Regions:
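Extracellular/periplasmic head regions of type IV pilus-like filament subunits
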Residues: 65, 69-138, 180-181
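Short, surface-exposed interaction loops/tails
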Residues: 126-181
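Short, Lys/Arg-enriched N-terminal segments with co-localized hydrophobic residues
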Residues: 1-7
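Active-site-adjacent beta-strand anchor residues
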Residues: 21, 50, 114
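N-terminal single-pass transmembrane signal-anchor helix
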Residues: 9-39
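Aliphatic-rich helix starts adjacent to a transmembrane/signal segment
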Residues: 38-58
Length: 181
């Protein structure tokens, strides 16, 4: 007999059984996998990098316009050191870092006027553009299948935006005034 007149068969057990604990762990594990798949950390990082590209392309575009304003409408020469020209002129204090393209199939533009992955095109009388390839699915899906998504700053339009081109080797052109997204 136990104290208080209880016998061993009526004693209440406190705590969880091993089976109950395993079921809870399995449910939590399943929820964790579902949440991880929904968040897709690779695409989260790609969207973050794309946001940085939007910002940098816009800043470079404004610097090009300021350079042209201070140089009687003449834009920087199209070369592999076009950003250094903006730094030397005092339009920006430091060249933006190189673009990190981490998603398979995404690469810098093939133009010859590329510095640190930032692309530049200039046509006399038409204006200049700064552009970079976008990599997140959220931006790529704004274009039709097989097309490439770019962030572009156009001096002809006086602003930046997203542009779709026929494919990854078709680049935006200077004088662009219409944006896809």
């Amino acid at each position: 007999m136990l104290k208080g007149g209880e016998n061993m068969t009526t004693q209440i057990k406190k705590g969880f059984t091993l089976i109950e604990l395993l079921i809870v762990i399995a449910i939590l594990g399943t929820l964790a996998v579902v949440v991880l798949l929904a968040l897709d950390p690779v695409q989260q990082l790609a969207r973050t990098r794309d946001s940085g590209r939007y910002s940098s392309v816009t800043q470079l575009g404004h610097a090009i316009e300021a350079y042209a304003t201070g140089n009687n409408g003449v834009y920087p020469t199209a070369s592999t050191t076009w950003i250094d020209t903006l730094v030397a002129a005092g339009e920006i204090t430091v060249a933006p870092g190189a673009i990190a393209y981490n998603v398979t199939g995404t690469a810098a533009c093939g133009a010859t006027n590329v510095q640190n992955g930032w692309c530049y095109a200039f046509t006399a009388g038409t204006g200049a553009i700064v552009f970079a390839r976008l990599e997140s699915k959220a931006n790529i899906n704004k274009c039709a299948a097989g097309q490439a998504a770019w962030v572009v700053y156009s001096t002809a339009a006086g602003r930046g935006g997203g542009v779709c081109t026929a494919n990854a080797t078709t680049y935006p052109t200077a004088g662009l005034t219409t944006f896809t997204f």
